[in-house]
Amino acid sequence: MGKEPGSTKFQTDFRRHLREQNISGNLVHLLCEIAEASKYVINAVRTGDLGVAGTSNLYGEEQLALDVLSDRILRKRLMYSGVVCNIASEEMDEIFQVTSNPLGMFSVAYDPLDGSSLVDVNLAVGTIVGIYQGDNLLQPGRNMVGAMYILYGPRVSMVYSVGKGVYEFTMNHLMEFTLTREKVQMNPSGDIYSPGGLRKKYTPENEAYIRYLEDKGSKLRYSGGFVPDINQILMKGKGIFMYPALTDSPNGKLRLLFELNPMAYLIEQAGGAATNGCMPILDMQPEGLDQRAPIYIGCKEDVAKATEFLNGACA
C-alpha cells in the first residue's frame, strides 16, 4: 500500500525525486517544466477572468478565457522546453509541430484545464498530461513514457507516473512540490462510484450495472470534474468512475488522447484497470485528435464486473 501523507522521513522536492527514478535527463526536464507551468495555471484559476473568450475549440465548445490562458501557459512552456517536438491540446484544432527532428524528443498531449466550467462555482479542476517518446501522438496509450495530472483544489496536488509506480506531490506555501504519497495502490474493489452522463440516456446494460452498485451499497461520489473524481478514487484506493456510452452518444463524452489515456495509465500503474467496456483503454488505437470513448476506470474487480454487464454490447 502507498504511504500516507507525511510518512516520508524528509521532504523530497520533485526534481530530486525524478533524478532518482533512473529516467532520461530530458524527461526529468519536461516533467519539471510542466510542474512549473502549473504554478501559473493555478494563479490564473485563482485570479483570472471567468468570462467567455469568444472562440470555440475543435469540438465546437465555447472556450472560456481561462481555457485559452491555461493552454497558452502550457504550450509556451512546452515549446521553449527544448525537449518537445509535437504538442496536441484539447483547445487546439491540430497538432502543433515544435521541431521536425524527433531525436531524443517527446510529444505531449494535454487538457490544460479540465472542468473549467466548474471554476465559477469554486469547484476543483485540473490539468491532464500524456507524454510519448518521439513524434507520434496517434498511438496506443500503452506506449506512453509518462502521464500526470495536477489538481487545483483546496490543495494543489500533482500525481504522476513514468512506469515506476504512482506518486503524489503537494504544493507547499512556497509553491514548491514536495512528496506526500509514494507507490499509491488501488484495492481490488471498493464502495464508491462516480457515474457521468444523464442517467435516462444510459443503455440497459449500464442501467443494470448502476442498479447493481446501488444494491450492494456503493456510495455515489460525483463532482462533475474528471480530475477530482479520479483523484478521489486513486487516493482512497477504491471505487470506479464511469462515463458510459449514451443512447445519443455511443462513444461517450471524454477524449481518448487528452483525458482517458493519461488517467488509464496512472490507474493501471496503481494496480487498477480501465476499459471502454470491450478492451483496455490503453490498447485503443487513436484515429484522430477528436476521438472519444466510453470509460470504466478504477478497481480491477469493479471494472471487471462492469464488463460482465456489458457482455454482448461489444459485438
UniProtKB/Swiss-Prot annotation:
Enzyme class: hydrolase
Catalytic activity, as annotated: beta-D-fructose 1,6-bisphosphate + H2O = beta-D-fructose 6-phosphate + phosphate
Cited InterPro entries: FBPase_C_dom, FBPase_class-1, FBPase_N, FBPtase, Fructose_bisphosphatase_AS, SBPase
Required cofactor names: Mg(2+)
Main subcellular localisation: cytoplasm
Signal peptide region: none
Residues holding Mg(2+) 1: 90, 111, 113
Pathway: Carbohydrate biosynthesis; gluconeogenesis
Residues where substrate binds: 114-117, 222, 253
Note describing how the cofactor binds: Binds 2 magnesium ions per subunit.
Gene3D superfamilies in the record: 3.40.190.80, Fructose-1,6-Bisphosphatase, subunit A, domain 1 (3.30.540.10)
Cellular component terms (Gene Ontology): cytosol
Enzyme Commission identifier(s): 3.1.3.11
Key words of the record: Carbohydrate metabolism, Cytoplasm, Hydrolase, Magnesium, Metal-binding
One term of GO molecular function: fructose 1,6-bisphosphate 1-phosphatase activity
One of the GO BP terms on file: fructose metabolic process
HAMAP family, A to Z: FBPase_class1
Sequence similarity: Belongs to the FBPase class 1 family.
Subunit annotation: Homotetramer.
Protein name as annotated: Fructose-1,6-bisphosphatase class 1
